[in-house]
Amino acid sequence: MTRVFDAPRELVFAAWTDPDRVAAWWGPKGFTTVSYDMDIRAGGTYRFCMRSPDGVDYWKQGVYREVLAPERLVFTFAWVIADGGLGQEMLVTVTFAAEGDKTRMTFRQGPFEAIAKRDDHGRGWTSTFERFAEYLATAFSDHPHTTEVDP
Amino acid sequence: MSPDRLDTTFAALADPTRRAILARLASGEASVGELAEPFDISLPAVSKHLKVLERAGLIARGRTAQWRPCRLEAGPLQEAAEWIEHYRRFWDESFDRLDHYLGQVQQGKGTRRGRKK
């Protein structure tokens, strides 16, 4: 996913790495941040709780792999599930490129870290939503079991 | 969808040959020979790929001795697509809020915590 924000790169990067700022925007519409604890440095961990509009709390946690201001942020995340265990761990890579006064942010998320390690893909294997979703859409557009999802 | 099943599906899809095989099967059943045709690899190599896809539940193979047609099983793919769509929506909405937050900060309106005044 790529977005262009009308803000300088340093500010956008800060929005991702200053805990108070992250709390201001992280999560879908209608969610609020309830609690957060972030140690933002390579190897640091974080825990974050957001509350849905109907009052359900969702905890997520992870480890920062790379914190390279103001251009690159890499971290894992997993939801904390019912019995305190963790769901699928995912790897997120966000890069920030300056475009004049604006910032082009590129975001990648993949559930492939465990697979990459297991299969020994040296550089890891992450996927953008768009590439994969495009593949599904074009490969299966004529198939009865379409992968299109209505907005 | 269980994390293991998702893992297996994505691992199966992580190979371009396997993705191409699935794309071909989207147009209908095919034999191993037919599937191998576009690729410059051996039949045993194609069979290996088919085993991975079969184990992931992405294809099913017929039982007739001579002719074991492969067909696409859409369930796991549909689940993977739904998983992707769920996260795309999740991040899309977060980024909308980020956009709004950045605007507020630059106008000097928002506090760092984004609390309403």
Can you annotate each of these PLM segments?
Chain A
Residues 12, 22, 46-48, 64, ...:
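Hydrophobic pocket/interface hotspot
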Residues 9-10, 40-41, 65-72, 95-104:
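A short, structured loop/turn motif at beta-sheet edges
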Residues 1-3, 64, 94, 107:
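A structural signal for short, well-ordered beta-strand segments
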Residues 34-76:
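Glycine-rich portal/gate segments that line the openings of hydrophobic small-molecule binding cavities
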Residues 74-127:
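Beta-strand/loop substructures that line and gate deep hydrophobic ligand-binding cavities in soluble
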Residues 111-151:
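A conserved amphipathic terminal alpha-helix motif
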Residues 1, 58-60, 90-92:
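Hydrophobic core residues within well-ordered beta-strands of beta-rich domains
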Residues 1-32, 151:
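Hydrophobic ligand-binding cavity/cleft-lining segments
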